[in-house]
Amino acid sequence: MDKNFLEIQNGSFSASEKNKVNNVNLVIKNQGEIISLLGPSGIGKTTILRTIAGLQKLTNGKIILKGKTLSSNSVHVEPEERNIALSFQDNSLFPNYKVIDNINFGKKRLNGNGSSLKSNEIIKLLRIEPILEKFPHQISAGEAQRVSLARS
């Protein structure tokens, strides 16, 4: 039987006493599958994503990622090891950095070598080569969102 890439079983998450999400069940069958969480403000979409990415703790239930069970009392898995990136509506690009520098910013901090083959493939896939030398205020909202995806 094939393992799912990600599964949440009766997951509960809490960003604060006010912002609680209970009994979430979710299955993502394949790595690379694109999903969207939709709902009104304050319903817990960001809390769920932050927990999956390892930025918040699971308070109850299980998250199974690539066959490895994560629970509120499990061994911590670093966010980088989860290999999950988040991209939100507010892309928060650095206004004084060119697009290419925005894309490579985190990579330079993590490994010191800047753009990688994978970054170049993503740049081509997202068709943002023509805007790499522009600043965020010089590009459209859609282009800014693609830059945010490339950076993540």
Q: Where are the regions that the model predicts?
A:
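ABC ATPase nucleotide-binding domain "signature" region
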Residues: 36, 86, 147-152
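The feature captures the beta-strand-to-loop junction immediately N-terminal to the Walker
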Residues: 38-40
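Helix-to-loop junction immediately C-terminal to a conserved catalytic motif
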Residues: 53
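Conserved ABC transporter NBD signature motif
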Residues: 61-72
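Conserved ABC ATPase "signature" region
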Residues: 68, 114-131
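ABC ATPase NBD coupling module
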Residues: 70-85, 109
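ABC-type ATPase nucleotide-binding domains, specifically the catalytic core motifs of the NBD
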Residues: 97-116, 125
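Conserved ABC ATPase signature
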Residues: 135-145
